[in-house]
From Swiss-Prot:
Residues that, per the record, bind Zn(2+) 2: 15, 40, 194
Molecular-function GO terms, alphabetical: phosphatase activity; phosphoric ester hydrolase activity; zinc ion binding
Organism: Yersinia pestis
Protein name as it appears in the record: Probable phosphatase YPO2037/y2275/YP_1880
Entry binding sites for Zn(2+) 1: 7, 9, 73, 192
Keyword Secreted appears in the UniProt entry: no
Length: 245
């Protein structure tokens, strides 16, 4: 069991079903110490408005011993790697995930998908690429793993990709984990929970990690401190309220 979950959605993304309060309650039950709310970026049809992300400053940092990070799952928009988290929004979030979503960036061929993903990492704002193993978006796996290591970006193992979404992802996810291992990069684990009961569920991710013998010291979710240190190393300000997690 990992004590950190880095990818989940609330009712602010209207195809999800839980509130911030629901996630806090579930985290306490499961001994999750830190989680990031990462609702979809505003270019998605049912995503929160820009103001939602700007107003996350009203959230508490710590509730009943559970740390809360203000995040976004932004959309990769084009081959230049542009995303729908820009300007003041970049300073409003602690954690910036970005990935491909069909309503914003329709699937392309392998070369174009790879170009867009690497360009997104190269822009320097994104911390994690979400569900890079999606078979609808084939990529050059060694190339993206090497780019992720170069730009200090984590690639995600997304538990939902094995259970509910993006059917056929497993072989790609296994290959990505092995490529990140060989490149010396970071893995991030995300439940991609759309309902609080799925918070912290990483059973499929854990199986892949074991199968490829991925080193625990290169997984961001191992402890709150590891994730917070990574974000600070990437230039995010320290969060004093979470210092003791």
């Amino acid at each position: 069991m990992y004590p950190v979950d880095l990818h989940m959605h609330t009712v602010a993304s209207t195809h999800a079903y839980s509130t911030l309060h629901d996630y806090i309650a579930e985290a306490k039950l499961k001994n999750i110490k830190l989680f990031a709310i990462t609702d979809h970026g505003p270019d998605m049809a049912d995503a929160p408005h820009y103001w939602h992300f700007m107003n996350m400053r009203v959230w508490p940092r710590l509730v009943d011993g559970v740390g809360i990070l203000r995040g976004i799952e932004a959309n990769i928009k084009n081959l230049d790697g542009d995303i729908d988290c820009t300007g003041p929004m970049l300073d409003a979030v602690d954690l910036l995930i970005a990935g491909f979503h069909e309503p914003v960036f329709p699937p392309q061929d392998k070369a174009a998908n790879t170009q867009a993903m690497i360009a997104t990492m190269a822009q320097g704002n994104v911390h994690i690429i979400s569900h890079p193993g999606n078979p609808k978006y084939p990529v050059d796996i060694p190339a993206i793993a090497q780019a992720a290591a170069k730009y200090n970006v984590a690639l995600e193992l997304n538990n939902s990709s094995f259970a509910h979404s993006r059917k056929g992802s497993e072989a790609n996810c296994r290959a990505i984990a092995a490529a990140v291992r060989d490149a010396g990069g970071w893995l991030a684990l995300g439940s991609d929970s759309h309902i609080a009961y799925a918070l912290g569920i990483f059973e499929h991710c854990e199986r892949i990690i074991a199968e490829v013998n991925f080193p625990q010291e290169r997984i961001l979710n191992v402890s709150p401190r590891r994730l917070l240190d990574y974000l600070e190393q990437r230039g995010r300000p320290a969060i004093p309220e979470l210092a003791e997690l």
